[in-house]
């Protein structure tokens, strides 16, 4: 099975070390463009663009990278409760059309009540997933070309429709990650690819089996992906030394502050990440070559595969054997590590190198009439 390898655009900051200004660098458009172009040339399938108040806006960043890349896809966040499904569907179709079918979407429900309140969202965990399920149903139907009337608990639309369809049919693929039962149910019923953070393989296997069974109950099959950091070097010793350097400027106070911030979230996945290290520096290798040091101060994906190319490739293939076909990777700093992964790791894997998409012909059309419909030629009788 060929593997889809993704990279990451660090719109929330980048540098040589975690938890410090030491070795950091400005993250401006030129730097993000360098990373995107490197990923494009090296054969990555796409890039994940993060979302949240600590990040630049993912949609604007993605749009700005379209003209400077050729085949790279952009995995961009959909934010239920923050954006209406109709507006999000229009944005999705436009991004897909402007990129010639290079748009992918990542459903993000949110997990930090403090940040959500700042965005005007006051739903609890269960309510957010209810809203996300309704949002996704409407979003998908709109991209399928339906005119939608929907009266749910959280979402109400009447006569919603898109005038401009996406390039990818039936719609651009929808990614999603969540560890709670309600999150897995949403994934099983509505998404195309279920993402998990990089837990030890035995825990990932349990998740995949649970989601696969839930999807089968809905008569569906979905794909699987994993989100990981990577520290790959020419030798295993060099890789482990690089891992230690990454956290060499971290102090206990910074770790404690980060863990306190993570503790206020209601994300089951974040709780599972924190349990892998319990906020302590010792015993960070939680599974062979799987290191939890990143999660001491970084929210979300907090583990890294560490080793030389053949070693890391063997661990990736262990995940692939569980049914995972997509790997969303990152490393610090992201420009240099994009090259290291491409040069030291890719030769040891069966990597699916994307082709440059051919321009898709679009039907000619006149200006929309009354902001309501596209004029079509009428056959003369």
UniProtKB/Swiss-Prot annotation:
Q: Which organism is it from?
A: Escherichia coli O81 (strain ED1a)
Keyword check for Flavoprotein:
yes
* Coiled-coil parts of chain: none
Q: What does this protein do?
A: Catalyzes the desulfonation of aliphatic sulfonates.
Q: Which EC class heads this enzyme's classification?
A: oxidoreductase
Q: Which Gene Ontology terms cover its molecular function?
A: alkanesulfonate monooxygenase activity
Q: Which InterPro entries match?
A: Alkanesulphonate_mOase_FMN-dep (IPR019911), Luciferase-like_dom (IPR011251), Luciferase-like_sf (IPR036661), SsuD_RutA_monooxygenase (IPR050172)
Known partners and oligomeric status: Homotetramer.
Q: Which UniProt keywords apply?
A: Flavoprotein, FMN, Monooxygenase, Oxidoreductase
Q: What is the similarity comment for this entry? A: Belongs to the SsuD family.
EC numbers, comma separated: 1.14.14.5
Q: What is this protein called?
A: Alkanesulfonate monooxygenase
Gene Ontology terms describing biological process: alkanesulfonate catabolic process
Which reaction equations make up its catalytic activity? an alkanesulfonate + FMNH2 + O2 = an aldehyde + FMN + sulfite + H2O + 2 H(+)
Anything else of interest in the record? FMNH(2) which is absolutely required for this enzymatic reaction, is provided by SsuE.
Which SUPFAM superfamilies does its entry note?
Bacterial luciferase-like (SSF51679)
Q: Which HAMAP family match?
A: Alkanesulf_monooxygen
């Amino acid at each position: 099975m060929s593997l889809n390898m993704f990279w990451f655009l660090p719109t929330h900051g980048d540098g040589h070390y975690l938890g410090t200004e030491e070795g950091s660098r400005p993250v401006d458009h030129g730097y993000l463009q360098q990373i995107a172009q490197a990923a494009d040339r090296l054969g990555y399938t796409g890039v994940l663009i993060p979302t949240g108040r600590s990040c630049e806006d993912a949609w604007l960043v993605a749009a700005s990278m379209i003209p400077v890349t050729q085949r790279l896809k952009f995995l961009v966040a959909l934010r239920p409760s923050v954006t209406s499904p109709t507006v999000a569907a229009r944005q999705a179709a436009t991004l897909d059309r402007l990129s010639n079918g290079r748009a992918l979407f990542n459903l993000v429900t949110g997990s930090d009540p403090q940040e959500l309140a700042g965005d005007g969202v006051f739903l609890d965990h269960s309510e957010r997933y209810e809203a996300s399920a309704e949002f996704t149903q409407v979003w998908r139907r709109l991209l399928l070309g339906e005119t939608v009337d929907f009266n749910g608990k959280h979402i109400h639309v009447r006569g919603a429709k898109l005038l401009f369809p996406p390039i990818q049919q039936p719609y651009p693929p929808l990614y999603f990650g969540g560890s709670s039962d309600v999150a897995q149910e949403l994934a099983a019923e509505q998404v195309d690819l279920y993402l998990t953070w990089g837990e030890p393989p035995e825990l990932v296997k349990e998740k995949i089996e649970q989601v696969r069974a839930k999807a089968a109950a809905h008569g569906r099959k979905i794909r699987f992906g994993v989100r990981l950091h990577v520290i790959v070097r020419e030798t295993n010793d060099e890789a482990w030394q690089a891992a230690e350097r990454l956290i060499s400027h971290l102090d206990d106070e910074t770790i404690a502050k980060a863990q306190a911030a993570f503790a206020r979230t209601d994300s089951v996945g974040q709780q599972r990440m924190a349990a892998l290290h319990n906020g302590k520096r010792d015993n960070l290798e939680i599974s062979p070559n799987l290191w939890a040091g990143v999660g001491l101060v970084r929210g979300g994906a907090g583990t890294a595969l560490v080793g030389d190319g053949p070693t890391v490739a063997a661990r990736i293939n262990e995940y692939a054997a569980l049914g995972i076909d997509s790997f969303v990777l990152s490393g610090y700093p992201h420009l240099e590590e994009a090259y290291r992964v491409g040069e030291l790791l890719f030769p040891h894997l069966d990597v699916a190198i994307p082709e440059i998409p051919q321009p898709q012909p679009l039907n000619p059309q006149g200006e929309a009439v009354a902001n309501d419909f596209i004029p079509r030629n009428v056959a003369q009788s």
